[in-house]
Amino acid sequence: QTITADYAAMRKEYCDRLTESMQGMVDKLSADGFNISSQVGWAHPRYEAIVKEAQEFGADLLVQHCRAFAKIKHIHLTHDSWQLVKHCPLPLLLVKDEEWGDSVVLMAAVDPMNSHHKPVQLDGQIIDAVTSVSGQLGGEYHVVHAYAESARPFTPAGKIKEEHTKAFNDFMSGYNVNEDKLHLIDETPVFALKDYSETLDSDMIVMGAISRSRLAEALIGSTAEEVLDFVKTDILVIKPSS
């Protein structure tokens, strides 16, 4: 009973400190005209409690801060962040420590080939999201589709590029996006998103994610994890509509 009482007291003291600290931020933002409130909770696993609270609150967007390791400038997602990517049904904004430029540049990553049983409507949701965000921020956006021709060495030369070009063009024909903002890249998704994001000097990547079986996660989940870990910009993760 003593241990239980001590634990409860320590937990309350810790939560009280967090509440006081957060209230300072709330007061400052409220003074700037924002309608904002704060809440501190104690739960395990934390990501489940976060998702539950966001759904009960009726949130349109969940924001998670991702810290970099100072010495190597590497953004490694915490367990909670990665679980949110996999399980949060809401749009999830992973915020890094890079500052946005004066003119915001966004990059949407799509897969019109619908690989790995990706829902057909997800790419449309990604374009809708990047269009909405860029409009609200007064920025511009580019659309990227990556494929790796070398991944299928026994396919006739040019066949893979032809398939992906047709799928990409057919999909984008339904949207009013200038050709100079459309990029078809012969590279694996990991390196394409990382390198082209740096080339465009983008401030945010908008990409999709789907919940997979444990077997599928073991086989292809590492690709998504590498993208999320190594890309330095903010990432907006979109989930398929129910």
Region locations from a protein language model:
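Structural beta-alpha unit
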Residues: 10, 27-62, 69, 173-215, ...
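A structural signal for isolated positions on well-ordered beta-strands in alpha/beta enzyme cores
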Residues: 37-39, 107, 140-142, 181-183, ...
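Hydrophobic alpha-helical segments and helix pairs
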Residues: 58-103
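Glycine-rich, Arg-bearing micro-motifs that act as flexible, cationic patches
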Residues: 64-83, 207-230
